[in-house]
Amino acid sequence: MGEISPAPDNLLNRDFSAHEPNKKWLTDITEFQIPAGKVYLSPMIDCFDGMVVSWSIGTRPDAELVNTMLDAAIETVTATGGRPVVHSDRGGHYRWLGWLSRIADAKLVRSMSRKGCSPDNAACESFFGRLKNELFYPRDWLSTSIEEFIAAVDAYIRWYNESRIKASLGLRSPIQYRKNLGIAA
């Protein structure tokens, strides 16, 4: 059986470092199973400092989920003319026409992991692990609605960007780090 569209080369080759913002972005989808149902998160993560540039959360892992996230990410670089490499796994979401046309229209560069090789997107997987260890696993979600859970994930990501310190950033959050460098409002 043929592929949806040809996969681009793996341009990152597990080099998740970037010396400035908006050079390398990572994306993927993760699933949360709570008693009320399944919820999916699609973030765009900047390799410069781990900032979650944009994200979408929904109840279906579909094209709308990833396209909404990509549109929001593109808006963050439109004014500066940034053209990051966008690295993903080989999921169909990243190979459908809607995704491809958005990438092409914004003049972004596609990169994909090798087939079945999750370490090729390890930094994104690491973010998912951190989020689940800090937010998801410690709590009982039994009486939580889908809407409440989505709000909790959204709040976590905002907290992560604004307040969660990282040793690699000199004990600053991504936004604090950027402010310290004079590259964030």
Question: Which residues make up each language-model segment?
Answer:
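Charged DNA-binding/catalytic regions of mobile-element recombinases
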Residues: 1-185
